[in-house]
Amino acid sequence: MQVQPEKLSIWDVVHAVDLAITTFIIYVLTTSITPLLTHHPAQPVGILWAVISAVFVFRDTREHSLSAGMSRLLATCVSFTLCLVYLLLFPANPFGMAILIAIGTLLMTLAGRRDEIGLFAITTAVVLIVAAENPQTAWQQPFLRLADTVAGVTVGITCKWIASFLFFRLSGQEAR
């Protein structure tokens, strides 16, 4: 099966530039605001997590971006809850990670949110792997990853909506 390259439209270029601007904005915000809130420099994992969250919600339409943002937040909230309870009781380790992923997968399935299982599992793995590096502050990891996710989702959706609105307002086409 041969794949035919698509022609790029002006919107495709705007979309690409908007995504690049979005990643720059969330990077700068994360590295600037995190030290003000935590009194420590932003950690690479936090910066990366915020950028990933912003990129994840950057979709072809505003509605798809909002839907992706809600999925990202739901998966992160389930992971946050399970990881926080676990880390308050036990040290982070691979066995605990596997158990939490199994429990969370079952909870997401029962809630009818199978599409978010992958997001939940990735988030849980990141939280527990990073928590294992520094056991004294392991319980903080769920809070930090939740904050990074909220920041990334907010910036990603906001930038997508602004660019989409402005482009289609100026071009006279219906907003996507």
Task: Label the model's feature ranges.
Residues 1-122, 126-176:
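Alpha-helical transmembrane segments and their membrane-interface boundaries
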